[in-house]
């Protein structure tokens, strides 16, 4: 069967992995238009921060600004100095630590945008990028070992210095799926394949994955033809896969789906949204898997006063800060969404944030730093033109600590701080933790 035939059959039967021409009628297209709604204001960073005058900084007004407006900050390409930024893409994944945003994989059918003859894996991106927060520099990481070829709608989590990648699909979508766990140590820049035993998941993409108490949990996904409601667990100590069999009747299980997201509180795994090529699931009620009772539960959430519930969606992003879960963007089957919502896992109360994404997207990726700053990258921004973006945005989801506010002011005042030696930085009074953020 030719690749073209594979794509055609996938349009009819399965879900797209990264948003494509099939997305209007299939699962995972990405949609169009630019949102004009905004918070109080969007802040666009200049090419290089200027050196401010010696003016005393008053922190209280700065903190109030974050509380009231939750500003979304666009990081334009001209600020990403030193290296070219990643080409526009969709279906990729990202994670973040205190120092870097790591972006893996992705898809773009536009030959020129995806690198033309220089991209041997067109229309996919077999590459790992790092965005350094302190300097605003993108860097394509050179790595050793075998980098996986399933580069769209895979799952990605960060475990210490290791990126854990599971599943995903190559081209044609649904014909070259994976079910291996690949590990990349970002410190030593080396890939390895985990040798696992037991009942592993099918070869799928669009599944959701979480790291809980030393185990990976994988739920849902699609083969490209069949959607799944299976739940698997990989114990990272024994490297044994187990297919969990919940104590429920089949009618009480969550609907089969892909491109959903999951959150957890250590006791339950919560399924947020997702869908199939013909539907997107509601967020009014969510399913939760109880790790202690081995059973699925259905939880009714509470609507935002005067606004109601968030729209049903798939292909959105989700990050978590303690018991607060934030979802943004996505596609509801008709339009691309640009809203941001918060769900508290103790009260199950939905709150709509006052921010609106400058570019409504789906099939994008998002990650949150330990300090509470979310970064959003890429995605599809126009359904009819099948257009992707390479934009990078950030938004503080919590009030930044005094340390974080001072750190951002310091970086703005001294943009070449990263060029100083460790000894010089210590003499300036920087802590070891902050020095590590510069390297």
Curated annotation (Swiss-Prot):
Kelch repeats lie at residues 87-154, 155-198, 199-260, 261-319, 320-364, 365-403. Transmembrane segments: none annotated. Pathway: Protein modification; protein ubiquitination. Residues 15-36 have a biased composition (Gly residues). It is found in: Nucleus; Cytoplasm. Residues 1-50 are annotated as: Disordered. Keywords: Cytoplasm, Kelch repeat, Methylation, Nucleus, Repeat, Ubl conjugation pathway. Residues 398-439 are annotated as: Interaction with CUL2. It holds the Pfam family Kelch_4. The modification Omega-N-methylarginine is found at residue 13. SMART domains: Kelch (SM00612). SUPFAM superfamilies: Kelch motif (SSF117281), NHL repeat (SSF101898). One of its GO terms (cellular component) is Cul2-RING ubiquitin ligase complex. The keyword Cell membrane does not apply. Disruption phenotype: No visible phenotype in normal conditions. Mice are protected against TNF-alpha-induced systemic inflammation: they show a reduction in the inflammatory response, but not in early systemic necroptosis. One of its GO terms (biological process) is ubiquitin-dependent protein catabolic process via the C-end degron rule pathway. Disulfide bonds: none annotated. One of its GO terms (molecular function) is ubiquitin-like ligase-substrate adaptor activity. Belongs to the KLHDC10 family. Substrate-recognition component of a Cul2-RING (CRL2) E3 ubiquitin-protein ligase complex of the DesCEND (destruction via C-end degrons) pathway, which recognizes a C-degron located at the extreme C-terminus of target proteins, leading to their ubiquitination and degradation. The C-degron recognized by the DesCEND pathway is usually a motif of less than ten residues and can be present in full-length proteins, truncated proteins or proteolytically cleaved forms. Component of a CRL2 E3 ubiquitin-protein ligase complex, also named ECS (Elongin BC-CUL2/5-SOCS-box protein) complex, composed of CUL2, Elongin BC (ELOB and ELOC), RBX1 and substrate-specific adapter KLHDC10. Interacts (via the 6 Kelch repeats) with PPP5C. This is Kelch domain-containing protein 10. The lineage of its organism: Eukaryota, Metazoa, Chordata, Craniata, Vertebrata. The gene is Klhdc10.
